[in-house]
Amino acid sequence: MTAKRLENGGHIDRSKALQFTWDGRALSGYQGDSLASALLANNQSIIARSFKYHRPRGIMSSGVEESGALVTIGTGAYRDPNVRATTQSLYDGLVATGQNAWPSVRHDFAAINNVFGRFLAAGFYYKTFMGLPPFELGKGTGIWMQYEKIIRKSAGMGRVERKADPDSYEHAHSFCDLLIVGAGPAGLSAAIAAGELGLDVMLVEQDELLGGDLLGQPNSDTLRNELIAQIESNENIRIMLRTTAFGLYDYGTAGLVERVTDHVLTPEPHLPRQRFWTVRAKQTILATGALERHIAFDNNDRPGIMTATAGRNYLNRYGILAGQEIAIATNNDSAYATAADLSKAGANVTIVDARREVANSLQEIASAQGIEIRYKSAPFSAIGRGHIKALELAQGSHGHWQASGSLSCDLLLVSAGWSPVVNLISHRGVRPSWNQENACFVANQDFLGIQTVGSASGLWQTNDCQESASIAVEQAAKAIGHTPNKNNTSTVLQPGGWESPIEPLYEVKIATKKSKSFVDFQHDVTSEDVRLAHREGYQSVEHLKRYTTLGMANDGGKMGNIIGLALMSEALGKDIPAVGTTVFRPPYTPVAIGALTGRSVDEHFRPLRRTPMHDWNLAHGATMTMAGLWHRPWYFARDDETISEAYVREADTTRKSVGLCDVTSLGKIAVQGPDATELLNRIYTNPFAKLPIGKARYGIMLRDDGVVMDDGTTWRLSETEYFMTTTTVHAAKVLAFMEELLHTRWSDLRVHVTSVSEQWAGCAVAGPKSRDVLRACVQNPAMMSNEAFPFMGVREGLLKGNIPCRIARISFSGEMAYEVYVASDYAPAMMDLLHDQAIIFDGCLYGLEALGTLRIEKGHVTGAELDGRVTIDLSLIHI
């Protein structure tokens, strides 16, 4: 590799040298470098190994689309795997290591997988080990279960640190009139226009510098500085750098993650590592830009192959000339500016253009710099192992290619078109449409206060990007209620802006020659994998995605999805629009779990709660876990049982005989008053007016937006009194919700709600022998008959020992079951009584793990479905 740092140029500070470590070797860079640029400057070619074949991977881009250079940052508990070297800011003392390789990324023993690549094609784990001919040895899943352990152990990229995360994280909320995502020329122009109108603007940029594409253009410093000066002088504009908008949600809500201290070795102790922002904006403008595409050709994953934009950015932003003999493969106009910049920096540049001809202005640019243009040409194969050394070229068009010679090079830059970043607007259900003229998907429609501008809407010229931003701000201001400038006139800008039309180019393949061309670089999905999926019937884009894992790596298919869709459309004999595209889901880029969790870790000042049976449970072998703020039995191990063995035994015993479970932590609310029935009718999705006294009813409670908030049973004790149970975690939330409704919306209702959770202790008695156990425990056995105590019935009586009790015949397991409640002081006595009888029937105690299993097998709602993200569509409409 022959990359070198230039003496001048770029947005780095050469007076501030930074020391860092790469795979144990001490290297240096400058303030303003990314880890990727610093590695390039130090001539580090192989940065990573691929997921499946362990092929060498180098730096392929300069931004969030990077799917090759994934590294691990930090040591010990601070280790962070799968970090893009292209987006990691360099800082003094940074420690970075390669991953998914042994003993190192330069010499990886697992690269032998590449030799057996024909046996590791798409879906191999479904077929290869499912029986070995001729005797079908291992037919079925038995032997697969053994292979699976090996496969899963070898799968993955970086290794997650098992120690507790020592970093802290925060949650924050904010509001604004206009949220602008992206601070390139379009985003900056939009912020200025909106700020001048007096709008409260939040400008979000994932990079550490404002400017976007302007940072990679050598003659744009004046424009960039002017735009930034106007923004910084306007107090209406809030700037958030190092902040990624990873998702858009209902009602103008956006999820942002601010990387507060990821760029320093030793942060201030009071600062979090990352901050998760929930922003509610009246209007949103997406100036998210576009990503450059690769081409599928033989060995297109070799180190030394990257996008043309990356080559230009490393030159003009970081002052690095990434090669001396540079080939640029393109099918569009944008690569010519890159070629000119590289040539001026001293490189010998050759343009390999798939088109028959280009505009005179482009020819003049090339001629002025002595750049050779090879028309109707494209790369067929990259030559070289650890780094590209030469190209085999092909001539032709429209899928008909013939070998045409070779070209020596130490760097190949690829520009096969641009894909507007429409991910965020797609989160709101807007499906992008195919623009044939520009060979890309664009969002042709705005959605409820969300607009795309600039190259995110398919505009390639800076002036057009800025004009589209002004138009969008005008429309946003009108929607908010502000009066825009009278002189502005809204026009519709059509995607495009190049002088010469693009020549769609996705794959270069010569029928008579074997090739291994990659579509998804991170997951090692090849073009042949896509064709295999087609032959095996996985022709829907969603099936293609899951069968081949195309686009399922942590880059989300930013570099390879379009190529995969094009290959599938070719196999189907359809146009790309007919094949469609997958739906983008948040997050746009990976988000640290810690950022989503925030401070909801470890113990807080809120007191931990224990049921009245806590000591009793421990004495009987319970292993405890946390459910909300409650300590609850997780499982009851016998001898040396593992949790897996224990919960299976507990569930099986409950199904066949009887099981006892401490359910005291369930929320319990007394609903009393003349209008108690009317209140229940309003807060539950199912009616309660006709519920007889002495009966219980299961109900679903929804939030205002139709999302499930809680479920539980409510028992009618008298004409004006009910006993409501809620889930453990949502008990306080449900009570607060009911109190809010009674104070603000339904203050006319004569109802009083009171938490009685600590007054009552509860035990679930489940299984076919549950009635026999209770019949032996109550003073009046006749009350337990099927006739006297029907399903969903509620009875009050006495347990032996004159213990007052309240019993309901309720099942959350599918078997006959009851819930027994007594005053909390009687809890240990109740458990002794029930347990002694359960043992007679070979029953057992069971914990939360078995309880969850029983609920799932029954088809009941589980905690995972009550997390505030699920609608009423839970197969519970019938209730």
Identify the residue ranges that each predicted region occupies.
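Residues forming the flavin
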Residues: 1-25, 29-610, 759, 873
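Adenylate-forming
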Residues: 311, 878-879
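Glycine/proline-enriched, intrinsically flexible loops and inter-domain linkers
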Residues: 196, 512, 522-524, 547, ...
